Design a protein with these regions (language model features):
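A structural signal for short loop-to-beta-strand junctions that line the ligand-binding cleft
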Residues: 71-76, 94-124, 128, 140, ...
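Mature extracytoplasmic/periplasmic domains
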Residues: 254-315
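Sec/Tat signal peptide C-region and signal peptidase I cleavage site
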Residues: 16-21
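A bilobed periplasmic-binding-protein/Venus flytrap-type ligand-binding module shared by bacterial periplasmic
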Residues: 123-130, 166, 243, 251-264, ...
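Early extracytoplasmic/lumenal segment of secretory-pathway proteins
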Residues: 22-86
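Short beta-strand->loop
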Residues: 27-30, 126-128, 148-172, 185-188, ...
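Extracellular/periplasmic bilobal clamshell ligand-binding domains
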Residues: 301-338
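Ligand-binding pocket segment of bilobal, Venus flytrap-like solute-binding proteins
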Residues: 167, 172-242
Length: 338
């Protein structure tokens, strides 16, 4: 009798373990409600429950590191390859192999440890009623003396700027990038302040001729989700895609990686693969105004109206953003970039 009870106990323990394992735990620094809707679609298709812990990057990373082997986190998702790369440098991701992910994602938008889910471009904004930028305008040009007092951009502690500078280091070297940063600082129309939308608003208000900001922000403003004033301001502004005569416009990603101690690795891989399907990509671009990672998907019309044929920088591996992040911040700080 005792033997039977023991076997039954093992049976239910195994059943319970299987039930618990049919889930995936995401730690996400992305702030979109639409992501949760996407995870619900994944659950409906696979039966795998998705548990989400949302927060800011620093807090999430601190928790994952402190919990160590006891962490229940399977998948870490965030915006910006620089953040993913920096976390990778701390040894918090594990190598992941997936034929589906490798086939779907261009090699420069992934690493052996993490994968791009969607793309964004960091571009130059201008008011066409006041400014006519040259057709060959580049990021490098913004440091030239003729642009003195004409440029607005966020602070140096912004990771999007750090990744932009990291890409310049990758392409031009530290010495040239340091000189560029000094020139850019001297050309700033004001001390850096505010978010990306604040830079676009400054150009709309005539405070500067050029603003550096990510592409999805103009679409967000045009959508009316940030109010009628920002919508009206955005209608005055256009994005310019720099470096079309060279390597192409600076691209970055939203992405995710499977964590070192992930208890549900197989489910985490399934979720990543789902995020790169046609259904998921269409959902992402139509809700976040990002560019799709896979071919054959059209971005939201609010971003597509500005053109889809621009040359993207497909040469620079986004994994270099994390590797060059410390050097980028040092260069920015030494240049007096607040």
């Amino acid at each position: 009798m005792k033997k039977i009870i023991f076997l039954i106990s093992i049976f239910f323990t195994l059943i319970g373990s299987t039930s618990i394992a049919n889930e995936v735990n995401i730690f996400s620094a992305r702030h979109y409600d639409s992501d949760v809707q996407l995870y619900e679609k994944f659950t409906a298709k696979t039966g795998i429950k998705v548990n989400v812990v949302s927060g800011k990057d620093k807090a999430l990373q601190k928790r994952i590191i402190e919990e160590g082997k006891d962490s229940k986190a399977d998948l870490y998702i965030t915006a910006d390859a620089g953040r993913l790369g920096a976390f990778q440098e701390k040894g918090m991701f594990q190598k992941t192999s997936s034929k589906a992910l490798k086939a779907a994602i261009p090699s420069n938008f992934r690493s052996p440890y993490w994968f791009g889910i969607a793309k964004r471009a960091r571009v130059i904004y201008y008011n066409p009623s006041r400014t006519n930028p040259p057709s060959n305008l580049s990021y490098e040009d913004l440091a030239e003396p003729k642009y003195k007092g004409k440029v607005v951009i966020r602070k140096s502690n912004n990771v999007y700027n750090q990744s932009l500078v990291a890409s310049l280091i990758a392409n031009n070297g530290k010495k040239k990038t340091a000189k560029w940063a000094e020139g850019l600082v001297s050309n700033m129309a004001r001390k850096p302040k505010g978010n990306d939308r604040a830079q676009i608003l400054a150009v709309a208000a005539g405070e500067a001729e050029y603003a550096v900001a990510n592409t999805y922000y103009i679409a967000l403003m045009l959508s009316g989700k940030k109010g009628p004033e920002q919508q009206a301001a955005a209608k005055k502004i256009k994005p310019f895609f720099p470096n079309q005569d060279g390597r192409g416009t600076h691209m970055n990603i939203s992405g995710g990686g499977i964590l070192k101690y992930a208890p549900n690795k197989a489910n985490a891989i399934k979720l990543l693969e789902f995020l790169l399907t046609k259904e998921a990509q269409e959902h992402i671009v139509n809700n976040t105004f990002e560019y799709p990672m896979i071919e054959g998907i059209k971005p939201n019309k609010l971003i597509a109206q500005f053109g889809l044929g621009f040359k993207q920088d497909l040469k620079t591996k986004v994994s270099k953003y994390g590797k060059n992040q410390a050097s980028a911040l040092k260069i920015m700080t030494e240049a007096g970039w607040e």
